[in-house]
A protein has these predicted regions:
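Sec-dependent bacterial lipoprotein signal peptides
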Residues: 1-26
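Bacterial Sec-dependent N-terminal signal peptides
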Residues: 22-45, 74, 107, 113-127, ...
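Surface-exposed binding patches on compact interaction domains or structured appendages
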Residues: 36-39, 43, 59-88
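A short beta-strand micro-motif common to beta-rich folds, especially ectodomain repeats
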Residues: 87, 98-113
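N-terminal extension/subdomain marker
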Residues: 125-222, 498, 503
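Structural recognition of the beta-strand scaffold that forms the well-ordered cores
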Residues: 131-136, 166-171, 225-229, 304-308, ...
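Catalytic-core segments of thiol-dependent peptidases
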Residues: 171-190, 197, 201-299, 310-311, ...
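Terminal, contiguous helix-loop blocks that mediate binding/assembly
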Residues: 255-507
Length: 507
């Protein structure tokens, strides 16, 4: 016998049927798509020259059209449909002014009128706030690393770090050939354009280097210039005879200054293929620091900074040679792993403040933090420092007084100096401060030295991992951030150091 439903059950049944009906009705209704129109950027920046192009992407739910105000630029296309469309903007004229120029704007609207967007168009000034040069002379076994460095730079540029500043890359593809290219930002990507190709290059000659930088000044003029130099490095040591010949390596003696090198520190490769970096590529194709200084002086440039992506270039002898062509030297007193600087991390700091400035703290910190973790536990080695070149001559005056007041340096076997390489015998590079502390016992002079060292190589920029790499991990027990060859008994040092500007200024 079926029991009659109570009023409560009837209410529950009816409620469930009503909910089911509403759900089915909602599922059958067609969902109306919300009208939308977006652009990848609200400002397009054209380079300063006529014909330069920049792009942005339009994403739309329906047909759209574009109108412009202002002038001095062309746009294509001016309409599109559903989906994504790339719009290209082209400069009609050069911007000959010294400031960014507002050319106009583009108004985009859906055909239904339900959404719109505006993109402004500006043109970079004829003279950039800064131009950074990535200088990569032929360095043999580092070429593939240079290509990786450039790819890392492109990652940074794709983040729109340049703004109105410019970045050019000089890259040698062989001992005699090379090219000059500009990297720039466009629509979320890094693009490049070739500015010039070179044949029969000899970058060991001052005239060649001057010619390269004269062209850069002409093509990418700027209020300020910075440069990164990637290659193998050997501090101030003359290009001729900078390495050890095979016979010398076996005999444990140093070659004469004119010996053609056959064995270099970067040729000591670890079992898993790791090696390090020299300012040049070996033998007669290396560039002396004095030659580079002569060339840049002739080009009429004083860099804001020279960032050496090379071994041993944080050297007081090097700093003295280059003091008049740069405000700062960013370098390592020891070897740099062949990978070099992590440019995807470093480049944003070289284009700080909207591309107009640079952040030395950020550069040093990003280098240090990268190498703290680099291929641990065998190769997490790195050291960096910044030398203030305007303080180098004052440091030379202090050092001259110390030399005049001190007897000749005699090594103390109980207190070995902090050395920065272990592949040449005798060692060529030692920590400057450690050397001075053992050379001089005059308290007043040492206090003066400490104070001047703090101004010349500021402590906040002296960063290093626990070890540096030189044929293996080597401990850092004291670190002033800068080396000297003064205490070295190496033949190449003894035969040449008295010809350096630093030696002449301090003796």
């Amino acid at each position: 016998i079926q029991q009659p439903e109570t009023p409560y059950l009837q209410i529950i049944r009816r409620t469930l049927w009503l909910l089911l009906a509403v759900t089915l009705l909602a599922g059958c209704e067609k969902t109306e798509e919300r009208a939308g129109l977006t652009t990848t950027q609200d400002e397009v920046v054209l380079r300063s020259t006529a014909g330069s192009e920049a792009a942005f992407t339009v994403s739309s739910t329906e047909a759209w059209s574009l109108t412009t105000t202002g002038g001095g630029f062309d746009v294509s296309p001016t309409r599109g449909g559903r989906g994504e469309t790339t719009v290209t903007v082209r400069a009609q004229d050069d911007n000959t002014t010294t400031r960014r120029k507002a050319l106009g704007s583009m108004a985009l609207r859906l055909s239904s009128g339900k959404a719109e967007a505006t993109v402004s168009v500006v043109q970079s000034p004829a003279v950039a706030p800064q131009t950074v040069v990535m200088y990569l002379p032929w360095s043999g076994n580092l070429y593939t690393h240079f290509l990786q460095n450039i790819e890392d730079v492109k990652k940074a540029v794709a983040g729109n770090i340049l703004r109105d500043s410019r970045l050019v890359v000089f890259l040698q593809t062989s001992t005699t050939k090379g090219s000059l290219r500009e990297l720039y930002y466009d629509n979320g990507e890094c693009r490049e354009t070739e500015l010039r190709t070179y044949e029969n290059l000899d970058v060991t000659q001052a005239e060649t280097i001057t010619g390269i930088f004269d062209y850069i000044k002409q093509t990418a003029p700027a209020e300020r210039y910075g440069i990164t130099i990637g290659s193998h490095g050997m501090a101030w040591i003359p290009a001729s005879g900078s390495g050890r010949s095979t016979a010398d390596a076996k005999a444990g003696t140093e070659p004469a200054a004119t010996t053609v090198p056959e064995k270099w520190h970067w040729e000591y490769v670890s079992p898993d293929g790791q090696f390090t970096r020299w300012f040049g590529d070996g033998g007669s194709r290396c560039t002396n620091t004095t030659t580079f200084a002569e060339a840049i002086t002739a080009a009429g440039i004083r860099f804001e900074y020279i960032l050496f992506d090379d071994c041993f270039m944080s050297s007081i002898e090097v700093a003295y040679d280059l003091r008049k062509i740069t405000r700062y030297l960013i370098a390592s007193p020891c070897e740099v792993m062949a990978y070099g600087y992590p440019y995807d991390l470093v480049m944003p700091y070289l284009f700080a403040d909207g591309g107009t400035g640079y952040d030395l703290d950020g550069v040093c910190r990003s280098f240090y933090e990268f190498y703290e973790q680099y291929e641990a536990p065998n190769y997490n080695c790195g050291a960096i420092a910044v030398t203030v070149c305007d303080q180098v001559e004052t440091m030379a005056e202090v050092m001259r007084r110390i030399n005049n007041a001190s007897p000749a340096y005699i090594p103390d076997p109980e207190k070995p100096l902090q050395q920065y390489e272990y592949l040449y015998d005798p060692t060529r590079f030692y920590d400057l401060a450690d050397y001075v502390y053992q050379l001089c016992d005059d308290t007043a002079l040492l206090k003066e030295f400490d104070e001047q060292l703090g101004r010349t190589v500021p402590e906040r920029y002296r960063l290093h991992t626990e070890y540096f790499y030189s044929g293996g991990k080597r401990p850092i027990t004291t670190y002033s951030g800068i080396s000297t060859s003064a205490p070295s008994t190496s033949g190449i040092v003894v035969n040449n150091i008295q010809n350096t500007g630093w030696y002449k200024a301090t003796h």
